[in-house]
Curated annotation (Swiss-Prot):
The record marks 28, 65, 202-203, 206 as: Important for efficient shutoff activity. Belongs to the influenza viruses PA-X family. The keyword Isomerase does not apply. It comes from the Viruses. The record marks 195, 198-199 as: Important for efficient shutoff activity and nuclear localization. Its main location: host cell. The gene is PA. Plays a major role in the shutoff of the host protein expression by cleaving mRNAs probably via an endonuclease activity. This host shutoff allows the virus to escape from the host antiviral response. Hijacks host RNA splicing machinery to selectively target host RNAs containing introns for destruction. This may explain the preferential degradation of RNAs that have undergone co- or post-transcriptional processing. The lineage of its organism: Viruses, Riboviria, Orthornavirae, Negarnaviricota, Polyploviricotina. This is Protein PA-X. It comes from Influenza A virus (strain A/X-31 H3N2). It is found in: Host cytoplasm; Host nucleus. One of its GO terms (biological process) is viral RNA genome replication. Keywords: Decay of host mRNAs by virus, Eukaryotic host gene expression shutoff by virus, Host cytoplasm, Host gene expression shutoff by virus, Host mRNA suppression by virus, Host nucleus, Host-virus interaction.
């Protein structure tokens, strides 16, 4: 699983996942499924915010080609992927600037158009079950919840899906592709079932296959949301985007 993750996710996402696990004292060599889950969640958060901006009239627009105008503002603030101290600093800054209610738990994004924090969920189970778990944990109507599954299903607070259909389809396509790639390597069952994972760990099973290239529709896109995470994040003059190919498996 670790080899699969390193081959099929952008190096920046892998690095952020490694830092996250280290911060919580988790060993990615042992908890490889969690490593894969964190990378997947990070990718969905970045894809959620990709190409979405707010123009001078306060309207939400999509800019996919070239660099966006300096007059455009990023619609989403990415909180996920930061260390906890910096993440709470960003949340506090948003609350002080917008008047938003401070959440009890760290959310994943902030939507400047709808003026709300967003909790993103990616589940291997039924979306409604995971949604209820999230809602019971957060216990706040102020934080918007949006759940995606690896089967193409989704569920959101009050059926408000925030993004346009094409943007959501891009996320669903990527998740379905990850599922297919895992299944082709015999990794999916252990990823879904902790019991199966333990059984495979005891046997010392390890996938040796190389990751095949992803479908062109997904692999050729770039991810403007992969930015250097630093304190200047909240400034209007954001740090430069890391223009890396979005989560592309290397071709042999």
């Amino acid at each position: 699983m670790e080899d699969f993750v390193r081959q099929c996710f952008n190096p920046m996402i892998v690095e952020l996942a490694e830092k996250t696990m280290k911060e919580y004292g988790e060993d990615l060599k042992i908890e490889t499924n969690k490593f894969a889950a964190i990378c997947t969640h990070l990718e969905v958060c970045f894809m959620y915010s990709d190409f979405h901006f707010i123009n001078e009239q306060g309207e939400s627009i999509i800019v996919e080609l070239g660099d966006p105008s300096a007059l455009l503002k990023h619609r989403f603030e990415i909180i996920e992927g930061r260390d906890r101290t910096m993440a709470w600093t960003v949340v506090n800054s948003i609350c002080n600037t917008t008047g938003a209610e401070k959440p009890k738990f760290l959310p994943d994004l902030y939507d400047y158009k709808e003026n709300r924090f967003i909790e993103i969920g990616v589940t291997r189970r039924e979306v409604h079950i995971y949604y209820l778990e999230k809602a019971n944990k957060i216990k706040s109507e102020k934080t918007h919840i949006h759940i995606f599954s690896f089967t193409g299903e989704e569920m959101a607070t009050k059926a408000d899906y925030t993004l346009d259909e094409e943007s959501r389809a891009r996320i669903k396509t990527r998740l379905f592709t990850i599922r297919q790639e895992m299944a082709s390597r015999g990794l999916w069952d252990s990823f879904v079932s902790p019991r199966e994972e333990k059984r495979q760990l005891k046997k010392g099973l390890k996938s040796q296959e190389q990751c095949a290239s992803l479908p062109t529709k997904v692999s050729r896109r770039t991810s403007p949301a992969l930015k250097i995470l630093e304190p200047m994040w909240m400034d209007s003059n954001r740090t430069a985007t890391l223009r890396a190919s979005c989560l592309k498996c290397p071709k042999k």
